[in-house]
């Protein structure tokens, strides 16, 4: 991906699809939780790609919080899920768990303006708010919306240490 960036970029939707395919979990049943989560993740990847391509064409795509960053997180999460499944970590081979994890990665810096927060969780909270219509359109239940929000808010650098301590 780094060699392709940005001139031969394959697109974030393709990266999302390949991440899912690497997990070898098949096609979730229509109407299932995993199906809704994948629909959400795909719509996020599509929107981030469109927004990023437009900003890139205008010379305004953020240097760090860009499409390549989202792709990096999708690849890393895919490796973590595959390693967890190999080690037989509870839930790691469940389609809904994997779909949720990939959806979180796709949305964690949704439409990020670049730069740093001026107050705690500023950009993360904005991402959660801006993702609400996509969550509803995908038919995510309240629990999944809350989990997505919780995990996205946890990516604020000032909150990371507290979250690490909480899961010890």
Residue ranges of each PLM-predicted region?
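Histidine/acidic-rich helix-loop-helix segments that form or flank divalent-metal centers
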Residues: 91-92, 136-168
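Structured all-alpha helical bundle cores of eukaryotic regulatory proteins
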Residues: 113-139
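His-Asp-centered metal-binding catalytic motifs of divalent-metal-dependent phosphohydrolases/nucleases
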Residues: 73, 97-116, 127, 149-157
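Conserved N-terminal diphosphate/IPP-binding helix and adjacent helical/loop segment
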Residues: 1-54
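Alpha-helical phosphate/pyrophosphate-handling elements in metalloenzyme active cores
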Residues: 13-25, 60-100, 131
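Active-site flanking loop/helix segments enriched in acidic
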Residues: 42-75, 111-114
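Short coil/turn segments at secondary-structure boundaries
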Residues: 31-41, 61, 65-66, 70, ...
């Amino acid at each position: 991906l780094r060699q392709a960036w940005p001139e031969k970029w394959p697109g974030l939707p393709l990266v999302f699809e390949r991440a899912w395919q690497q997990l070898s979990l098949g096609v979730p049943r229509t109407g299932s939780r995993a199906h809704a989560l994948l629909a959400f993740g795909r719509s996020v990847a599509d929107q981030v790609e469109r927004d990023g391509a437009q900003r890139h064409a205008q010379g305004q795509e953020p240097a760090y919080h860009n499409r390549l960053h989202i792709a990096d997180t999708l690849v890393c999460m895919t490796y973590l899920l595959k390693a967890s499944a190999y080690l037989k970590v509870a839930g790691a081979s469940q389609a809904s768990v994997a779909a949720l994890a990939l959806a979180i990665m796709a949305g964690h810096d949704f439409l990020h303006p670049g730069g740093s927060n001026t107050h705690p969780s500023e950009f993360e909270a904005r991402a959660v708010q801006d993702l609400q219509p996509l969550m509803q359109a995908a038919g995510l239940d309240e629990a999944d919306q809350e989990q997505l929000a919780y995990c996205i808010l946890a990516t604020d650098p000032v909150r990371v240490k507290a979250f690490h301590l909480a899961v010890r």
